[in-house]
């Protein structure tokens, strides 16, 4: 009955406090960054940790890290709003707070920075990474002053893992990646079933808590955060049937509870499920082929990280997190291989991750691949240096209108640079300016242009040109040199910006298609969201 009571309180808090406390926190933070300019209501800084504490304290099968990450992000966002910062600055503060929350929970500053980069920042820039890194380092230092520098999860030092055994751990990672797809889809399938219930959603957590209580009665280890379970799995204390039961029941309990919309984290349950599954697979492999040298404890470590990599798509954060929290010196190669395999399987079989599926179902698109800005890599001189049709500054509108009506060569352009008698650029005029009925035929062109002219330099990037066009609300820019800023050498238009993408798209199209998720493996609920 205790989990049910806690779930009722959480449902009540969500109904009358804020519905944003539902879920595990990271998707909600991502959504605020992407679509709400990183503005998180101040009340969430209290409601989220309190609701999570009630949920976990009454037996909910969740980790505390998700709500802590969400709370840290909310604090950063609120601070940014108090200081009247820009949306970009609030995003950095939110990510710094979230990363600091993770670093303080596990003592894993590097993986916290990587998690912020892979899931929250949506960019890789010094202005973003440095504040996040400093926040994570500070949070870890504070943690060490209270609990010491011991790793979050105790694990004996294992022997060297090399040769053919690495292939075994890669295979384990692939199988755990397949399981991560099943876990993710199951959670959202259960959520879909709750949405069909003819009762208000504030009562759903109580229904989910019934399953939590029943399962917890028969297997108490499924209740609560379960960090002790992770310790026992990694140290090899749990084995055989116990591992299988814990893996299955923890998954059922957690997925039902999370699907019901209560408050709690996903990381610890994923680590428990993945670690137990990895240990079972490694033990099975060792029994079938003893010569491989598979170690169930290393299999547990790989499985723990691979489950997180497959479910969240945070590949580098998963690898480094497992290393930082266990300080297993010879675990990097198995971790990198296993997590990469899990990431690949998840990417091929599932369009969205456990972090982004909820956002996608609300009709929003979440970026999943990041690359250097192509426009930043192309200079204006590469596309904008060409002969330009110019107009003399002393021409009258009457002569220009007659020339354009004649459809003479060059007269069909939408904009024209205006050149003074000495050959210097004084501005740009458009067809709309020339044919404006409010301007008489006797007007001369010099009177129509703005001074000084808005120009772009030949050594600027196309990104600079695009930004300038947006800021000035114009569709073309004269190109000049820095040495001679009034001498026209070309022009660049919006069409040039679009055409600059053509080589990149042609080169990448075939490769990107090969990595697209397969519609065959997508469930109807996921298909309807895209």
Give, region by region, the residue ranges found by the protein language model.
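Generic long, charged, amphipathic alpha-helical segments
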Residues: 281-308, 434-454, 458-461, 465
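Short hydrophobic beta-strand motif reused across regulatory alpha/beta modules
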Residues: 320, 426-434, 489-497
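Flexible loop/coil segments at beta-strand boundaries within sensory signal-transduction domains
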Residues: 421-424, 483-487
